[in-house]
Regions:
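Exported/periplasmic ABC-transporter solute-binding proteins
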Residues: 22-274
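Small/flexible residues
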Residues: 6-7, 237
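Positively charged n-region of N-terminal signal peptides that target proteins for export
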Residues: 1-5
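Bacterial N-terminal signal peptides
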Residues: 7-17
Length: 274
């Protein structure tokens, strides 16, 4: 009898542990969302409010995060781009929690204030190689980009919306993390790169002051132009689930759409609600 009671206690404890583990959240995907939202206060605020913990926040990029979700390795993926047709066919659901711009950055001493889409396309396909050809100084253009084979949303969206699907030019400097693209640009007066506007906040102040975002087609990336889509490289920030959100993933998504969650989004990005 005593052994039976002990066994029942052990079983109850085991079920409690398993239940607690089942409540944990795991995330993989966009570094824009991971760094600029989850690690910028959202995960901690959600833990405080719900008791549900994030045991993993991995940031391999939107494409790889979605694949991890499809493989059953995580409960929640992040995508800083719209879902592709083939992803929707796999019954994935994306919930928009905010908006972002892929901003074009140059060194602060660069006199160029705006580029057209065609000029930007020419730079990143290697057709335009000198700043004087786009209204700047007589100096070679030194573009950098994220790693082109990374399947990251910024690389794919920029290629689709700016390059019209054309291949990137040969010889682009490829950098693993978008934050490090800005760090590199701060040290290269003739440089240019395209990075999430929201991630600028993660760059040290002394380096951040050495770069500037420029207009695209004379439209600056700001709350109004990004939310309306007037800025060419605007994009939604999605939390992605396999089917309709449920369980801890649903709780977190619901939290991100509350006033508290949207205030966290607004620190670095454009919230869904004004």
């Amino acid at each position: 009898m005593k052994l039976r009671k002990i066994a029942l206690v052990v079983l109850a404890l085991a079920m409690t542990v398993l239940s607690a583990q089942a409540e944990d959240l795991t995330y993989s995907g966009s570094s824009t969302i991971g760094t600029g939202i989850l690690k910028a206060g959202a995960a901690d605020a959600f833990i405080q409010k719900s008791g549900i913990n994030f045991t993993a926040i991995d940031q391999p990029g939107s494409g790889k995060g979605i694949q991890a979700l499809l493989d059953g390795k995580v409960l929640l993926a992040g995508a800083s781009r719209p879902l592709k047709a083939e992803e929707k066919q796999k019954k994935l659901i994306g919930t928009t929690i905010g908006y972002d711009a892929i901003a074009v950055f140059v060194h602060k001493d660069n006199p160029v204030k705006s580029l057209t889409k065609e000029q930007l396309k020419g730079i990143f396909t290697g057709q335009i190689k000198n700043w004087k050809d786009v209204g700047g100084n007589d100096a070679p253009i030194a573009p950098n980009t994220e790693i082109l084979t990374s399947k990251r949303a910024t690389v794919e969206m920029f290629q689709e919306l700016v390059l019209d699907g054309a291949p990137y030019g040969a010889g682009l400097k490829q950098i693993d993390l978008p934050r490090d693209q800005i760090v590199d640009l701060a040290r290269v007066p003739n440089g240019i790169c395209s990075v999430s506007l929201g991630l600028l906040a993660s760059v040290p102040a002394d380096l951040k002051s050495k770069v500037k975002a420029i207009a695209l087609n004379n439209i600056e990336p700001n709350d109004n132009s990004v939310r309306s889509g007037a800025y060419l490289i605007s994009r939604p920030l999605l939390l992605v689930t396999p089917g309709l959100p449920k369980g801890p993933a649903k709780e977190f998504i619901s939290f991100m759409l509350t006033a508290e969650g949207q205030n966290i989004v607004a620190k670095n990005f454009v919230p869904v609600r004004k």
